[in-house]
Amino acid sequence: MNAPALEARGLKRNFGALIATDDVSFVIAPGARQALIGPNGAGKTTLINLLTGVIKPTTGQVFLQGRDVTFLSSSARVRMGLSRTFQINQLFPDLTPAESLGLAISERNGSGADFWRVAGGRPAIVAEIEELLTRFGLEAELDQPTRKLAYGKQRLLEIALALATRPRVLLLDEPAAGVPEEERQDILAALAALPADVAILLIEHDMDLVFNFASRISVLVAGRLLTEGAPEEIAADERVRAVYLGEDAHG
C-alpha cells in the first residue's frame, strides 16, 4: 500500500491563548486533487504554514510520502518534494519568466550559484524552461520583466516556478486571488493541466474554481476540520452552507 503523499496527524498550533489550529488530521493521496476551504480567520494560512515548515506545531505531526517531516525546514521539505505558491506573489520582478524558471531549475539541480553560466549552456535546462513556458502560456512573455506581466500571467508564472522544483505535492494558496474575472479561466486551465502524478491541495475562496477542480474538499472552521467529502457532498452539507457557502451557493 502506498503511503499518502501528505498527511497531518493531530496538528495543533497555539499562539499564546489563541488556538489557531486545533487537532487537524487529514490525508492527501498521491495524485489527488483536493481543496481546502473555510471562512476568513478559519486558520487556513496557519495550517499551510505548518504543512510547509514555516512554523512548527505545538503538538501533532506532518508526514511527506510516509516520512515524518514535522521538524524539518521548509527548504528540506522542498527538496523532498513539497512545494507551494503564495497568496501574494513571491516573484523576481526584474527577471524575465525564462530567467526566473532557469534560476528555479538550477537551484533544484544544485547549481543555483552558477545560474547565469550554467542555464544557457545546458540544453536540458533550456528545454525544460521552454516546456514550462509553453505549458503555462507564457511563451510570448518569455523576455519581458515579470513586473510588466498581466497579473494573471504572474500567477501562472508562480505556479510554473513551483512546478519547476518537480514536486510530488503542490500546495496552491489562492492562485486566483486578485486575478481579473476574464483571466480566471486561464488559471483553471493551468490547474487542469498539472501533471496527474502530482498531488494538489488548493486553498481558494473562488468556489467555482474549487468545485471545478477538486474531487475532494476539506472544510476548516475556527481551526478545526468541520467535514470532508466529494464536492456534491460539501455543497449539500447544511453546516457548510451556514458557515461558508451561503444558502444559494451551488444549488
Q: Predicted regions span which residues?
A:
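Glycine-rich phosphate-binding loops of nucleotide-dependent enzymes
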Residues: 2-251
